[in-house]
UniProtKB/Swiss-Prot annotation:
Statement: the UniProt record of this protein carries the keyword Magnesium: yes
Keywords of this entry: ATP-binding, Cytoplasm, Kinase, Magnesium, Metal-binding, Nucleotide metabolism, Nucleotide-binding, Phosphoprotein, Transferase
Name under which the protein is recorded: Nucleoside diphosphate kinase
Enzyme Commission number(s) from the entry: 2.7.4.6
One Pfam family this sequence matches: NDK
InterPro entries with a match to the protein in the record: NDK-like_dom, NDK-like_dom_sf, Nucleoside_diP_kinase, Nucleoside_diP_kinase_AS
Cellular localisation: Cytoplasm
Primary localisation category: cytoplasm
Top-level class of the enzyme under EC nomenclature: transferase
Physiological role: Major role in the synthesis of nucleoside triphosphates other than ATP. The ATP gamma phosphate is transferred to the NDP beta phosphate via a ping-pong mechanism, using a phosphorylated active-site intermediate.
Quaternary structure, from the entry: Homotetramer.
Lineage per the UniProt record: Bacteria, Pseudomonadati, Pseudomonadota, Alphaproteobacteria, Rhodobacterales
NCBIfam families assigned to the protein according to its UniProt record, in alphabetical order: PRK00668.1
GO BP terms: CTP biosynthetic process; GTP biosynthetic process; UTP biosynthetic process
């Protein structure tokens, strides 16, 4: 399996509860390396641009307002099959359907406040990483 990079966002519900360290421990325990990380507070316009692919979905307004409500931690994870591994560690979008031991099962408050975001494909990962990080910020 190839070494990949993927974007991870620790969402406001998790940063508000100081869960960044616990969430990152789960990524690292799964063999993923954090090669870039920063804590930021998205503006509503930035959240709308980042989630623009969902602009016609009924949850778009609620999602973007939530993502701009408080700070988030954006980071790049690297490892073998990082995209799939990250999604496995995160668990199902709905925490009620997430497997035991996953981030969402353990920390999510609801489908909307589900603690983490992760890229779903190599193309998406590249776009999402470039949205938040320059090449100089990626330290492998």
């Amino acid at each position: 399996m190839a070494i990949e990079r993927t974007l991870s966002i620790i969402k406001p519900d998790a940063t508000r509860r100081n869960l960044t360290g616990k969430i990152n421990a789960k990524f690292e325990d799964a063999g993923l390396r954090i090669v870039a990380q920063k804590r930021i507070h998205l503006s509503l316009a930035q959240a709308q641009k980042f989630y623009g692919v969902h602009k016609d979905r009924p949850f778009f307004g609620e999602l973007t307002e939530f993502m701009a409500s408080e700070p988030v931690v954006v980071q790049v994870l690297e490892g073998e099959g990082a995209i799939a591994k990250n999604r496995e560690v995160m668990g199902a979008t709905n925490p009620a359907n997430a497997d035991e031991g996953t981030i969402r099962k353990e920390f999510a408050l609801s489908v909307g406040e589900n603690s983490v975001h992760g890229s779903d494909a190599p193309e998406t990962a590249a776009e999402e990483i470039a949205f938040f990080f320059s090449g100089l910020e990626l330290v492998g």
